[in-house]
Design a protein with these regions (language model features):
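Patatin-like phospholipase
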Residues: 1-65, 77-334
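Gly/Ala-rich beta-loop-alpha elbow adjacent to hydrolase catalytic centers
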Residues: 67, 71
Length: 334
């Protein structure tokens, strides 16, 4: 006599077969290996982490990734596969942090901003060096390296003044971009710094400390995150010149990018933007870049990223259709 199968067992087997068949079918019609970029933005980058996490659950694989500032930490977190744990860890340390600025520390000679220490702790918690190396995924992290031309800038007071001037120029340029005006302040300041763009890749990941330092190099936003320096070289947030690194990916590969502000893509090549799928939050993000006191905002930004990915799943898969599949659909519809 044939064994009697419980209905639930039969249903599970059917679903398993459908899932396997669906995976094969998906691989035939869609590009499953993609390039993925997350813009910098401090806590806002948790939105990008949530978006990437949701796409991974569909079976999409990252062939190449790029990140700037906090976006760099997020793309590496996606490679390590511990997104949920990292969000929970950061929520917990943020919950214990009552303020973004501690004046009392100033008189003790300590850092008045808690951000850098909390940032480093989260990076150390979430980074699995062996997973990153063994993944085979190409990684690009954008930063700025400066070697001041003027010897006088070795004076700490003058160096601090130039740092303040850099921050002011960036904020004023962002304001003008929102108004649709041409900007040039940052370029003038960068010339004083003798600044050039630097791309770190997975080939620069010698060990865990190197990975951590590269992320910090890309995230240097004084005074919140101190200027990272090595000898006479200074590193600044890569977002000062390019906060969404799309240009490094092969033009024939499907590329998805996440950013948060309209000014991020101002000045980018229109042809580059046309061949990418770009995503911004569907509603105002519930947290600001440097608010390290709001665990609920962190979680909500992450969950909004996941939700927006789900809401746009059909659009994303339409973008990921292979060229022959699009052609077949076009011929069928004629």
């Amino acid at each position: 006599m044939a064994p009697i199968l419980d209905d639930s067992i039969a249903l599970e087997k059917k679903q398993e077969i459908q899932k396997k068949f669906g995976g094969v079918f998906q691989g035939l019609w869609f590009e499953e290996e993609i390039c993925f970029a997350i813009a910098g933005g401090g806590c806002k980058a948790f939105y990008g982490l949530g978006f990437g996490h949701e796409m991974k659950s569909w079976g999409l694989k990252f062939r190449e990734v790029s990140g700037v500032s906090a976006g760099a930490a997020m793309v590496l977190c996606l490679i390590c596969g511990d997104e949920e744990e990292c969000v929970s860890f950061f929520e917990n340390i943020v919950r214990k942090n009552p303020a973004n600025f501690y004046l009392s520390r100033l008189f003790k000679g300590e850092r008045v901003f808690p951000h850098e220490e909390m940032y480093r702790k989260t990076i150390r918690f979430g980074m699995d060096f062996q997973k990153i190396v063994k993944s085979g995924i190409k990684v690009f992290i954008h930063t700025l390296k400066a070697i001041p031309k003027e010897d006088s800038l070795r004076n700490k007071f003058r160096l601090a003044r130039l740092i303040a001037e850099t921050a002011k120029a960036f904020l004023e340029d962002e304001r003008d971009k929102k108004r649709g005006l041409n900007t040039g302040r940052m370029q003038r300041v960068l010339r004083k710094w003798n600044m050039k763009e630097v791309l770190f890749t997975e080939k620069d990941f010698d060990d865990e400390k190197a990975v951590e330092q590269i992320i910090l190099n890309s995230s240097s936003v004084p005074p919140v995150v101190s200027v990272q320096s090595h000898g006479n070289e200074y590193y600044f947030d890569g977002g000062l010149t390019n906060n969404l690194l799309l240009e490094v990916f092969p033009p024939d590969k499907k590329t998805i990018g996440v950013y948060y502000e309209p000014t991020t893509i101002v000045g980018k090549d229109p042809k580059l933007l046309e061949r990418c799928y770009l995503q911004t939050p569907s509603e105002p993000l519930p947290i600001t870049s440097f608010d390290y006191t709001d665990p609920n905002g962190v979680r909500r930004a992450y969950e909004l990223g996941k939700r927006d990915a789900r809401l746009n799943k059909d659009k994303i898969f339409e973008y990921l259709k292979k060229d022959w599949a699009k052609a077949a659909f076009f011929l069928k519809s004629k």
